Amino acid sequence: MNKIVFAVIGAGWRAEFFLRIAAMLPDLFEVSRVLVRNEAKADRFQKKWGIPSVTTLDQFLEKRDYSYAIISVPWDANPNYIAEMSKQGIPVLAETPPAPDIDGLLKLHEELPSNAKVEIAEQYLYQPMHAARIRLARSGILGEVSHVQVSAAHGYHGISLIRELLGVGYEKAKITGHQLTSPIVKGPDRQGLPESEEKVQSVQELAIFQFGVKTAVFDFSNVQYFSWIRGDRILVRGDRGEIVNDEATYLKDFRTPITSLLRRIDTGHGGNLEGYAHRGIQFESEMIYENRFESGRLSDDEIAVATSMYKMGLYALDLGPSFYSFAKAAQDHYLSLMMKRSIKEGQEVVTEIMPWSSR
């Protein structure tokens, strides 16, 4: 296919992910323009990235030489831009979440045209190992999956993994949440490495979700993304097997258990001269995940973001299906907000079937 051409609204830390990926995959992606409201920042941005920068929405809309618009702005600005682009007939890939709160989600649901092409850039489902686990969970090898435990991402990100691994939709859920604190030696953060040893408090959110007969445990600590000593944990259980992190155990028949690894395949290790890249995830004799962006030498999170960008390019041109719709994103954020309500109130909450479930 031809290059996927997109435009970007926003110039923050997260917006640069999309520009960096486009720069690393120039045969696949091209950035048409970036909307930066502040003139001085727009000038700096254009010099840094070599991409035309505009400062008004009218300028952004003046020449529609892009297939879709990426919206990467603060939470409170996100719904207005999503609604405006949709009314203009422009396909949208918006950052998570689509609106800050439940009222905002409901309002945006009402405002969006029925034919709006709005997808949300939830990348965790497309990180290589998560994508491999999801595929294995859906393959039937574990039997019917009825329980998962996810400690890999905060809020709606973690819940998106829970719902995909469990295979649940928009049904009601019972949620019981708790918050725990514990001391930890401070590690790196967005600003870089720690300059001295410092003990801080880690805040951990725990919640049990009940979707009828299916259950899940959400577990995430606020230091987990950067900490060297707080790792991710994933458990997926079916009636014929389970996945524990990168190991799957299943029944070949009722008396023959098999244990196999989800094995990461990378190039560039040791004497391998192909150059460093992630190739895919192998399970037994099959590559259950293959990285289509191997030439870009991307990190796992960049691979995941690039996957959303690629899928959006296909969807915008009617060459592929919806992949993470407004409705899916709204449901994940709704469940996250209800989890926080349970934590705050110290009691079980019960969710409702929301209007976007029929979208």
Placement of each model-derived feature along the sequence:
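Short acidic low-complexity segments
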Residues: 52-64
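Short, well-ordered coil/turn residues at beta-beta hairpins
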Residues: 72, 95, 219-220, 238
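Rossmann-like NAD(P)H-binding beta-loop-alpha module
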Residues: 128-147, 158
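Rossmann-like dinucleotide-binding domain that binds NAD(P)(H)
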Residues: 144-235, 357
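Beta-strand-loop-alpha-helix segment that lines the small-molecule cofactor/substrate pocket
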Residues: 63, 68, 73-75, 79-125
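C-terminal glycine/acidic-rich active-site capping loop/insertion
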Residues: 198, 234-235, 240-323
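C-terminal helix-rich "cap/oligomerization" subdomain common to oxidoreductases
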Residues: 3, 68-70, 287-359
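N-terminal Rossmann-like dinucleotide-binding module
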Residues: 1-49
